[in-house]
């Protein structure tokens, strides 16, 4: 009993001095959870660097706002296809968010960060390096689909295989989990950003207009993954005239959006279908029983779950909070990690 009291006191003091962190550094959004303090960041993964000086001008939501207010302001994501592409920019972005945790304590926090299953050693090291430069004293990297499955409420300790598909902004990550371990994994670096980019390119080519990113996102989500060419709908949206640079209104056909999203969407669906078909027979039988769970922003695409159910013949469900499944699961993994001291083990 004395041992448990001592452990509890030590954990409590650590939460005060240096709250440990769970990090979901995504291509589109970054989410940070501080042990004992809850979610301390849920903002766009954007950073605006001052031209010439290289100084950080804005981060996260503020960088996104500046981009909307000033068409010459240019904010970028330091991630590409789900992994860190610019360590320096990623560390500056994380440092801004980690400073909120360090205001809560006086020591450098430890961190648990999530990475796609297909991230190579160099890409994992880039994530670790960016997090350390940002102020973390130690970093451990965990697979995103495991965090997503836990955050979606799956019992990952079950002896029966369960499939989770996390469709983020930069990568679609597919995994089968059994008895607390990843049995099979596969990933394709085609995801929501590719759908959005394809919509923007199609509208630019056919209408001579540059779509605002949020408008491309809205069209993508409203039209969804149904592939419906039969029923045409018209959408009034806002963009910028490519010739004059002036704001303009455009009436866009749903057929254009369907045609735009189909190629990247087909890559995603085919990757999931291949992962299902490649399962060993015993695992396949278990997944038929347990079904497929969708997480990530792509899980909210209208008609996607039905399309995947038709393609795979599996029961497909969308997690209750798909956008936050990874960070919610990472929070739970952090609690276990603190108890087992994963940074030293």
Go through each PLM region and give its residues.
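Nucleotide/phosphate-binding catalytic cleft detector across ATP-hydrolyzing
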Residues: 1-167, 175-292, 299-345
């Amino acid at each position: 009993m004395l041992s448990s009291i001592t452990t509890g006191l030590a954990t409590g003091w650590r939460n005060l001095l240096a709250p440990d962190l769970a990090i979901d550094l995504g291509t589109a959004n970054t989410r940070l959870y501080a042990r004992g303090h809850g979610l301390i960041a849920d903002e766009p993964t954007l950073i605006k660097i001052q031209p010439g000086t290289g100084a950080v001008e804005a981060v996260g939501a503020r960088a996104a706002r500046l981009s909307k207010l000033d068409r010459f302001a240019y904010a970028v994501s330091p991630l590409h296809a789900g992994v860190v592409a610019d360590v320096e920019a990623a560390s500056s972005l994380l440092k801004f968010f980690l400073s909120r945790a360090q205001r809560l304590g006086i020591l450098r926090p430890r961190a648990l960060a999530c990475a796609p299953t297909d991230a190579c050693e160099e890409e994992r090291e880039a994530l670790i390096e960016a997090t350390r430069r940002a102020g973390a004293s130690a970093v451990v990297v965990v697979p995103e689909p495991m965090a997503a499955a836990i955050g979606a409420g799956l019992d990952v300790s079950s002896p029966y295989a369960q499939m989770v598909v996390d469709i983020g902004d930069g990568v679609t990550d597919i995994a089968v989990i059994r008895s607390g371990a990843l049995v099979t994994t596969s990933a394709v670096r085609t995801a929501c950003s590719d759908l959005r980019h394809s919509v923007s390119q199609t509208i630019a080519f056919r209408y001579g207009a540059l779509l605002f990113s949020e408008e491309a996102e809205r069209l993508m989500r409203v039209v969804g993954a149904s592939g419906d060419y039969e029923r045409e709908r018209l959408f009034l949206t806002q963009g910028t005239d490519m010739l004059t640079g002036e704001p303009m209104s455009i009436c866009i056909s749903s057929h254009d959006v369907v045609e735009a999203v189909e190629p990247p969407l087909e890559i995603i669906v085919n990757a999931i279908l291949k992962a299902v078909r490649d399962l060993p027979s015993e695992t396949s039988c278990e997944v038929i029983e347990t079904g497929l769970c969708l997480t990530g922003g792509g899980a909210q695409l209208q008609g996607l779950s039905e399309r995947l159910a038709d393609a795979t013949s599996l029961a497909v469900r969308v997690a209750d909070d798909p956008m936050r499944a990874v960070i919610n699961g990472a929070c739970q993994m952090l609690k276990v990690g603190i108890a087992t001291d994963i940074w030293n083990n």
